[in-house]
Amino acid sequence: MKRRLFLMAAAALTLPSLALAHGPTRQKITVTAEVAADPAEVWAAIGNFQDMSWHPAVHSTTGEGDNAIDATRQLVLGAEGGPTIDEVLYKYSTEKMSYSYRITEVKVEVLPVTNYSSHLTVKPRDGGGSLVEWRGAFYRGYPNNDPPEELNDAAAIAAVTGVYQAGLDALVERFGAPGS
């Protein structure tokens, strides 16, 4: 009986500490933009996995596999010789004007995330034009508890949101906003 009481007391003392031992949680964001151009025109500009020249942060894109599943690309950011992001395509649909990809390699100093996947979609907008949706899911750049500020959840969310917003703002600048 004493042994059973001891085990129950030990379990009661241990369980609360296990609740504090969790790691990071998967973050999810969605950023959208409305543009005046019809979906086919917007898709023609952004639908090629091997060409991210429409994004102002991307200096160049090189890759293999066109728009086939498992195609790869490397984005060079900023300028020649700038930091890189390696990505792989895992879903592509011309009919749905959508593709999905994940990062296979990036330094957390460049983008403070791990296990990142993303989806880019163009849809018709009620009233004409297009709705471009860019959504992603990822973990912060630091996998353990108590991350440094530059690798915490807030830093990861801010960085990915900034990437998406810059790209979508460039599309609005290129194609115009509805009603403008």
Predicted regions mapped to residue ranges:
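N-terminal export leaders
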Residues: 3-7
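Glycine-rich portal/gate segments that line the openings of hydrophobic small-molecule binding cavities
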Residues: 34, 51-57, 61-111, 169-179
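Short, solvent-exposed aromatic-acidic interface loops
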Residues: 104-108, 135-142
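A conserved amphipathic terminal alpha-helix motif
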Residues: 131, 138-180
